[in-house]
């Protein structure tokens, strides 16, 4: 997220949060060679310009992902990513471009770069093959619906083609967009809606994300048609068929309390949203064992303004 580094739960929910994150911790750490663990993480201007890098590496090494997608590797090139990826035991790495707001992929297994694509994107996407999968890491621009839809259409076309070819695909990243499956709880995020509405109203009508005071969902709707499955939401719905608002906030991926306007749990609660996703083609989704947004330990409140997303699959 860039245009608004804009919750957690109310203070009477600490036990619920602890239990939820404890379950995720064991699901995400008890993997062996028969499983594949995937991490997506927007690291906020290269770990807050390096200030949170050591804490980030320490946390990643507790999770032990097999594949990791990264956004906001600001100023990093591929050589730097390859060097630093050894800190979390990933000997293979690829980056979208030579600098700027970069996108990266690191892996325990060799990476074949299929495409580094920027045309028609503000940032772009990195398409690679690793661990027998097509892995696409993206970062969508939050400025307006038309630009985002152009980016979404390109991702839709790419995944549709790969799916028809029989490829298993992971599309992950910071989408700066919301899923229609989150509408019920997003409609209640009034502080967030109020914060965004004034800026959104200044855009041309066709570029507005908020209509009649509520978020719309054209971007993720288009991407999910590819077809792709939102594995975090799927696993959440199985566990919580009739979720409360507080339970829904457990899958929010942004913002952490590192940002000034959400310094407390009480303030943060009204601004939580889910804009970071791990999406997969149907056959791979069937092999998903667990998926969620890591909201603990507390160090995640200081590493980035985003929370990481993790999914585990049967190999």
Language-model segments: residues:
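Active-site neighborhood of phospho(di)ester-bond hydrolases with catalytic His/Asp-centered motifs
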Residues: 68-71, 170-174, 230-233
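Catalytic metal-binding/acid-base residues of hydrolase active sites
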Residues: 44, 74, 141, 175-178, ...
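Active-site-proximal beta-strand elements of phosphoester/diester hydrolases
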Residues: 35-45, 132-142, 172
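His/acidic metal-ligating clusters that form di-metal
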Residues: 149-175, 216
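Metal-dependent phosphoester-hydrolase catalytic domains
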Residues: 116-117, 161-162, 181-315
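Structured beta-strand-rich core segments of catalytic domains in phosphoester-bond hydrolases
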Residues: 70-150, 292-293
């Amino acid at each position: 997220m860039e245009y608004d580094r804009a919750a957690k739960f109310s203070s009477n929910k600490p036990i619920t949060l602890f239990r939820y994150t404890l379950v995720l911790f064991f699901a995400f750490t008890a993997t062996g060679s028969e499983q594949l663990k995937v991490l997506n993480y927007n690291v906020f201007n290269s770990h807050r310009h390096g200030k949170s890098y050591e804490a980030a590496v320490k946390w990643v090494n507790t999770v032990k992902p097999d594949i990791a997608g990264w956004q906001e590797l600001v100023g990093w090139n591929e050589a730097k990513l390859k060097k630093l990826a050894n800190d979390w035991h990933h000997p293979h790495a690829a980056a979208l471009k030579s600098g700027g707001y970069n996108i990266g992929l690191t892996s325990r297994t060799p990476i074949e770069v299929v495409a580094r694509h920027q045309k028609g994107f503000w940032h772009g996407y990195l398409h690679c093959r690793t661990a027998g999968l097509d892995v696409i890491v993206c970062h969508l621009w939050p400025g307006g619906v038309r630009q985002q839809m152009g980016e979404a259409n390109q991702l839709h076309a790419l995944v549709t083609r790969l799916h028809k070819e029989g490829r298993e695909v992971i599309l992950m990243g910071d989408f700066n967009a919301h899923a229609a499956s989150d509408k019920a709880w997003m409609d209640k995020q009034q502080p967030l809606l109020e914060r965004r509405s004034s800026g959104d109203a200044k855009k041309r009508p066709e570029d507005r994300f908020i209509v009649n005071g509520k978020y719309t969902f054209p971007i993720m709707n288009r991407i999910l048609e590819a077809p792709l499955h939102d594995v975090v939401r799927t696993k959440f719905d199985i566990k919580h068929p009739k979720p409360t608002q507080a339970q829904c906030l457990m899958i929010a991926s942004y913002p952490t309390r590192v940002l000034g306007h959400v310094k407390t749990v009480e303030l943060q609660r009204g601004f939580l949203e889910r804009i970071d996703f791990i999406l997969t083609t149907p056959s791979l989704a069937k092999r998903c064992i667990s998926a969620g947004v890591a909201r603990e330990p507390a160090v995640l409140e200081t590493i980035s303004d985003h929370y990481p997303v993790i999914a585990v699959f049967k190999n």
